[in-house]
């Protein structure tokens, strides 16, 4: 069970997150939302074509369930866009107990057939409720994270950490390469093994990346070395080449 609480990257009261998530469940989009990252309010909305024009409409419907608190979408930034998925970073402004707060929400619109996942349980402490949600399949999450790292989309330490954690949760990796291939194909992108290898080597040898990771893990008290993450990238590279990985 996941508990919704404040993240080190979230600079607003945790109760506002609970208000938003509870509103989503009460709205007509409740059955379509799939949470990718509860701590940082990253979510998929499946079977619904989102764009910069109708995002306001979606959140207006969601936020109407809390009339005593005003949530206003003030900024919509497109991060990633193709026929497979559309990813936006949304900034929501609200006033709570006399203070103004900005809540970043990452919203990804995907087709009906993605993602297909398993059920999990979310506990909303404020409302004493348990809700069933769906999670993206681990192979698809790993593929999507790997793709963003290879393409330099939002490349940062959190993305590398996410890759490492997802890989650690995978018991069977036989479908990883297929998921990555499907992602590239759906984006009409060429999966060039040589380019993958070069990109991994670039990440491995980049002194700034390594130094930033060391500071990041020290600050967050994370016992994962940079070379551990590189091993995950190497494993994926071998899988894409069609090799066999001994674990």
What do these predicted ranges mean?
Residues 2-33, 41, 48, 52-247:
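Structured mid-to-C-terminal alpha-helical surface segments
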